[in-house]
Amino acid sequence: MFMYPEFARKALSKLISKKLNIEKVSSKHQLVLLDYGLHGLLPKSLYLEAINSDILNVRFFPPEIINVTDIVKALQNSCRVDEYLKAVSLYHKNSLMVSGPNVVKLMIEYNLLTHSDLEWLINENVIKATYLLKINAYMINFKIDLTVDEIIDLVKDIPVGATLHLYNILNNLDLNIILRISDEYNIPPVHDILSKLTDEEMCIKLVTKYPMENVINFINQDVRYSPTFIKTIKDFVNAHLPTMYDGLNDYLHSVIVDKDLIEEYKIKSVAMFNLEYKTDVDTLTLDEQIFVEVNISYYDFRYRQFANEFRDYIMLKESRQITMQTGDKIRRFRRPMSLRSTIIKKDTDSLEDILSHIDNARKNSKVSIEDVDRIISSFRLNPCVVRRTMLSNIDIKTKIMVLKIAKDWKSCALTLSAIKGIMVTDTINTVLSKILHHHRNVFKYLTSVDNKEITVCNCSRCVSLFYRELKSIRCDLNTDDGLLARLYDLTRYALHGRINQNLIGQRCWGPLTEMLFNEDKKRKLNNLMVYIKISDMLVYGHSIEKTLIPITESLSFKLSVDTMSVSNDQYAKVVIFFNTIIEYIVATIYYRLAVLNNYVAIRHFVLKVLHTVMEACGVLFSHIKVNDKIEHELEEMVDKGIVPSYLHHLSINVISIILDDINGTR
């Protein structure tokens, strides 16, 4: 199968014959080229057609002709801003900044605004400071004034770390405000203004309320050196041993002489105060042994010889091994990470690098088309090679050579690979090509049924089903029947354009998105599935619908490390649809094995899973064969996190059947 359908290859041939000038080909071919992303920068004459085909095409036009409203729509439909969209956005930055708070929010998330831009927005009363602070408080690094009510309202909606940052930028912060916030919202008053508090009892209350937050460092100096205060803090520290509070220990070390600390705490003083103390392990009391074991990481770092002797002693006396501990300290706060980014990581051997290499080689010597084909063949699954080639800075003759090769690419449907002794037909590239051929038909179908209630839907697939109600309303997720009932309902919802991209607490980890969007293929499944026990895998029945989003709202461009690798939004969303079904399959099987610890009749259960998915999609008379070797592969999947290649192969065969059924080519 050719990667591109015949009419797309014909349109590309016409473009090549016109030396890549899209204005010189017929309007019929122009529309095809736009639909399949077979273009580079675009002329003004195609603006309306290109925008109607895909709003993100706005980035390929000269910035001076672009409508600001189209840029807004493009920003709303993207999760990363590449150099092209960034350029047109910055060109129209002033207009975008006054286009409303939602647009400003997008610009902040994409890092399109500077600190001076934000200061201007606040000073000119275009946007309220509180609105910007709720988006990302760390963006504001200049002094501002807020009322007490505004501060309290903010604290309710921003993380603790952002509140502490807010303290540092407020002109009118006072002691009463931070004490009120501490009392009502349990946010530590870690700010210099706390030093104005001279009430010793209140200081003790705050320090003991937040022992991990180093409130002690902001306490009034007179209070810090009060004998009563010192004794109270020491008693608090002693009462919580073997748990250690490093900040309080540092404080005690600063107000009590070393000799007294060593005399009272002995071997504990090594971990608590980093003091030197020598002793034999066989003289330790039971209390000291417990303390040392709990805090062994401190001894590993500060007194390694003693730590080793202690381990040997415990092994000898109790036949028990004390492992190396990391001694992780609790990190107080982290800045929120934005899902959106303007940073696009570049592969070590990106297509652009390879094109540049080919271009340079052509200038110095004759390069055969066979050599070029071999060099770029690893990119045959990328549906946007044509666009990236045309956008590159290489010579037009090199571009034409590459485009002629890409035009005639075929999916390697007959390539065989050995998976644990089983010869498995590699079908993933064929499926991706089929999706590229028929994605508009599939997308049209998904959007035509996305507003229908599945229990009463009379679409062509539902009308042939034996069971049209929700199967999982009353089910036991500890049984195979319960898992299959939920899978049936999830898949039926997906077929009606509503999916859960976050079923296991991770997004877009299936084989199609990994292959197509250049995600990290080496991620171990057991790392991906770490939250499966508390994820949406526990949801069933009517509650499923609350976890779903329309396929039209899935942020397809979030998937791509390089946004240029996505042909168009509809194509990406159809890939997400089929990829999500594969994720449902793998997650259901993994849950049964890893969470329920049920390894009985694995092959038979896999067979049931695959046929449940097909049945839910209205495919009632197809059969998938499953080899017995699936059992060994799935055991390795759970034990070692190895990607289940054969299961992926089976799942891809299933979605290929579903694709053909939706497209009417089965």
Curated annotation (Swiss-Prot):
One of its GO terms (cellular component) is membrane. The gene is OPG074. It is a single-pass membrane protein. It is found in: Membrane. Belongs to the orthopoxvirus OPG074 family. This is Protein OPG074. It holds the Pfam family Pox_E2-like. Keywords: Early protein, Membrane, Transmembrane, Transmembrane helix. Induction: Expressed in the early phase of the viral replicative cycle. InterPro entries: Poxvirus_E2/O1, Poxvirus_O1. It comes from the Viruses. The chain crosses the membrane at residues 574-596.
